[in-house]
């Protein structure tokens, strides 16, 4: 399996995103661009003021299946996985991020996300919207997990997360449901 690593790109908000694409053919500027926009939009919407670092792996169903099995003992592929570095509380993030900063980089390592582009393409077709919107939505979903949101219940937690996902997506050009 060939891997391509795109060196971390820093935005003006001091966000470093380390993207790894497992297939050279998937090194699409549009995918990188929407991931970056959605990471930035989520951090802004959630009021994160710390300089952050996020690792993103874009893989296929086989790759995410292996990660899902190894990390969660779930023997099937999924669309996105999130691995937060810290246990944060959704909607109640720290005002002072000093204790979370890596002393070497000066950045807050929020965690890792894995996206199955193969699954995103299938879901975009299934839901009748663009691949761009699906990858963006999965990125926002994963970022919210890194920031302490969860949807394990069918009640308020899930509703809160869904509401945040839709609000953030609506604020990004090209991310509307249509």
Predicted regions mapped to residue ranges:
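An acidic/histidine-cluster motif and surrounding catalytic segment
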Residues: 2-136, 144-178
């Amino acid at each position: 399996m060939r891997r391509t690593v795109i060196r971390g790109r820093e935005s003006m908000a001091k966000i470093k995103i380390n993207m790894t694409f497992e297939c050279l053919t998937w090194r699409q500027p549009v995918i990188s661009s929407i991931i970056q926009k959605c990471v930035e939009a989520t951090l802004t919407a959630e009021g994160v003021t710390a300089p952050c670092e996020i690792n993103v792996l874009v893989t296929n169903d086989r790759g995410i299946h292996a990660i899902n099995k190894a990390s969660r003992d779930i023997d099937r592929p999924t669309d996105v996985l999130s691995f937060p570095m810290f246990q944060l509380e959704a909607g109640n993030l720290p005002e002072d991020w000093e204790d979370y900063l890596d002393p070497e980089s000066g950045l807050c390592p929020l965690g890792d996300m894995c996206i199955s582009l193969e699954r995103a393409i299938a879901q975009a077709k299934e839901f009748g919207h663009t691949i761009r919107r699906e990858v963006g939505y999965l990125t926002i979903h994963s970022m919210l997990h890194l920031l302490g949101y969860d949807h394990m219940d069918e009640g308020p937690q899930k509703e809160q997360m869904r509401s945040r996902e839709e609000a953030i997506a609506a604020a990004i050009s090209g991310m509307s449901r249509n």
